[in-house]
Amino acid sequence: RFTRRSETPDDAFPLRLRLLSEAELVQIFIAHAHSQPDLRQVDRSVIEARLFTWKALRQPQNVPGIDAGEVGAIARFWRERVPASRQQMDDNLWYQFAQLLPSLDLSARASAWSLLWGEQQELTRQWLALAHILHQTGNARELAAPLSLLVDNFALPTDGFLTPDIDVEGEVVVHPRAENQLQNAASIPLATLALLTRELVLPAVDGVLDNVDIIDIPTPAPQDNPPLWQSKCRWLLDGYRQQLQPDVMMICNATASRTETAGTAKALVSWVKETQSGQETALPGLVWAITLHDGRF
């Protein structure tokens, strides 16, 4: 996100990273699981039995990270992704989820969410590890990070954070931000931080309008058994749609093959329906940018 509306940065930690929430992480894992052709749906009887068991695990107070409203958003996303004939959860079960999950600890919540991706143990372990990092930051929505995340000592781009297809090791020290104040530092593995980052916020030095942000939404080409980072990138448009963003979307690249057209069109139509007024006098919200290098012509 390029913005003119940027607070005065900390010299040692000038970068701003906006993180996924726990609920958004669940949505990404749902999307990731449903990119697999052989996903097994959990039977309703199993879900009911699990819910009965988890009721005994309620904590005296709600555990930070998710609330009933966010569970409702997950339910809507799940229903959009799963064909009606394969849905094993109705309104009653989702209501029980919304009432129960905010009062469960993180491990129990991971077991509950795993019902939405066929109780695949590897996915559940991966989700739980990422969710633990979110809790380590105090469920902060924003972090302050050092410039070394992007460039080296010679101001040259570094591999890793912006190139998720490259395996990187090491950790980076960041500070959660709350009420414009830096909180206690946390050390997070670089690859994990890249997965949990929803937006990298950069200052726009020059701009026509001071109150306009520009968001670059990456769109990796679909592939069989995609890695998690690709599923996250392809989920981003859904995430912005749920927030009724952006005001205007500009399509700057073509699909790599005709087989991708139907899925891409469905995502764009869904975005238009939820974010645009539909009035004939309204300015267009979906715009195609045509360049000399456009693959469509």
What positions do the PLM features span?
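Conserved beta-strand/loop subsegment of P-loop NTPase cores
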Residues: 247-252, 278-296
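P-loop NTPase motor core
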Residues: 1-129, 255
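Switch II (G3) loop of P-loop NTPases
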Residues: 1, 18-22, 209-232
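Conserved catalytic network of the ASCE P-loop NTPase/AAA+ motor domain
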Residues: 6-9, 205-208, 240-245, 278-282
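Long, low-complexity, polar/charged, intrinsically disordered or flexibly structured peripheral segments
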Residues: 67-223
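Inter-motif core of Ras-like GTPase G domains
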Residues: 224-256
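Amphipathic helical hotspot of TIR/SEFIR-family domains
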Residues: 258-282
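Short acidic, S/G/P-rich loop/turn micro-motifs used as interaction or catalytic elements
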Residues: 220-222, 254-260, 293-296
